[in-house]
Amino acid sequence: QPQLVINAVTLKYTISAFNEVLPVLPDDCIISDISSVKTNLKEFYEQSGHPYVSTHPMFGPTFANLGQLSEENAIIISEGDYMGRIFFKDLYARLGLNIYEYTFEEHDKTVAYSLSTPFVSTFVFSAVMKHQDAPGTTFKRHLRIAKGVLNEDDYLLQEILFNPYTSGQVAQI
């Protein structure tokens, strides 16, 4: 019998994937996600009847230096199952990650700031850039970042940009 299920599907399918497996899980099985936006997950978890834990490794394959995880962060949602949080604290500590605990709301506010602001700034840069024969270092680095951001999963970008806290953050740009 499973004690923990980690849902790592694309954000678009997180809740539907849970709905597929919940009927076959024991009642005491902890369900968890690693989604980058937590909108609607708190309500889902509270209605699921299962203990839950929610985390967000604040890095991905596009820009993270997987050889230096000590430079990367992870958020563990402070709401939910105590043992599930302990499991992820231990796992992330073993990986050398910097660990922070936030509520669901604090997490989504942080994501609105730390992801949507750079993403929108990159979209603006991409919209106005033109070919440079002799680009400077800053231009080349930002171009590399822009290519990475624009190659992210479209639904992930949509979820980040439609996070309820994003519009207030982007309005400050």
Please provide the spans of the model-predicted regions.
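Short secondary-structure transition/capping segments
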Residues: 4, 65-66, 111-115
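An accessory alpha-helical subdomain
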Residues: 101-173
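Residue-level "edge-of-site" marker
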Residues: 12, 58, 105
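Rossmann-fold NAD(P) dinucleotide-binding segment
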Residues: 2-45
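Short, basic, helix/turn surface patches
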Residues: 16, 80-87, 125-136
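Short, hinge-like loop/turn segments at secondary-structure boundaries
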Residues: 3-6, 48-50, 71-72, 117-120
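A general structural signal for well-ordered alpha-helical segments in protein cores
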Residues: 2, 14, 85, 139-142
